[in-house]
Amino acid sequence: MEKYEMVKDLGFGNFGLARLMRNKQTNELVAVKFIDRGYKIDENVAREIINHRALNHPNIVRFKEVVLTPTHLGIVMEYAAGGELFERISSVGRFSEAEARYFFQQLICGVHYLHALQICHRDLKLENTLLDGSPAPRLKICDFGYSKSSVLHSNPKSTVGTPAYIAPEVFCRSEYDGKSVDVWSCGVALYVMLVGAYPFEDPKDPRNFRKTVQKIMAVNYKIPGYVHISEDCRKLLSRIFVANPLHRSTLKEIKSHAWFLKNLPRELKEPAQAIYYQRNVNLINFSPQRVEEIMKIVGEARTIPNLSRPVESLGSDKKDDDEEEYLDANDEEWYDDYA
């Protein structure tokens, strides 16, 4: 940790505090997610690190390394100076159709890359999409704590994610196709960009998860009259918001849809994207750490050392009261009626 110096706090996420730090040797800014040593270093954390390390795509935040402090495990990654896409939408209310398409195109290309590596994210949302600091912002997917690799793991069974973005089949307590669930979440993200609200939440009662689940299961959504979007866009949403995942649009179908292809930037077209799918490119190790070294550090982080003297605290792990709520396999009561 000695090679990094503190710049500022970035806030709390799923696992703990994130900080902006500077590499004292290269002057490069990085984001570091700090997680308490001990019981919090669980399967989700290990999975996030291993899945993240394997990724090399411009629409995915790049993993750099893990570091260990006396009290925390630090996950060092690329810093996205533009902040969350959610914050950008919140500041303007909603996007024009053209702007929403611009970000949706990048989101789909990033998710398509994940799926090509047999990784499903399972918690795609606008808060987990960051922007770089360029004038035409590049979208970057982050936070792989809930991700599952179909190569290393069985099909997902647990109910995880953020309620407003969850697909109907996730509530059925049986195995589901994580890739199809990601497609549904991308549709929710597109809707929020266009409308400035969640498609299946009651704006008068947004914390009523049972009502949200009812609307999700019934695919009960509408586009308000004040939102003027093209027929092609409406049709795309209707093909994504399909209760039966077998009938839902696939990423391949979305990428060939007329609305998606309109004004598609050259770097997102198939010839430019092809390089990221070449086996030798994905084997390039952008992190100086080998998997064995990473897992050794993660293993050490599961123990809390006896400290002979006080060390600097990173601050409270208490999350903000208004932070987004998450579901996991133990949050069963409110969706019992839909299993």
Swiss-Prot record:
Tissues where this protein is expressed: Expressed in seedlings.
Pfam family, one: Pkinase
Transmembrane found in the keyword field: no
Gene name as annotated: SRK2J
Catalysed conversion reaction: L-seryl-[protein] + ATP = O-phospho-L-seryl-[protein] + ADP + H(+); L-threonyl-[protein] + ATP = O-phospho-L-threonyl-[protein] + ADP + H(+)
InterPro entries (UniProt xref): Kinase-like_dom_sf (IPR011009), Prot_kinase_dom (IPR000719), Protein_kinase_ATP_BS (IPR017441), Ser/Thr_kinase_AS (IPR008271)
One GO CC term on file: vacuole
Highest classification ranks of the organism: Eukaryota, Viridiplantae, Streptophyta, Embryophyta, Tracheophyta
GO BP term (any one): response to osmotic stress
Binding site for ATP: L10, G11, F12, G13, N14, F15, G16, L17, A18, K33
Organism in which the protein naturally occurs: Arabidopsis thaliana (Mouse-ear cress)
Protein name, entry field: Serine/threonine-protein kinase SRK2J
Coiled-coil features, chain-numbered ranges: none
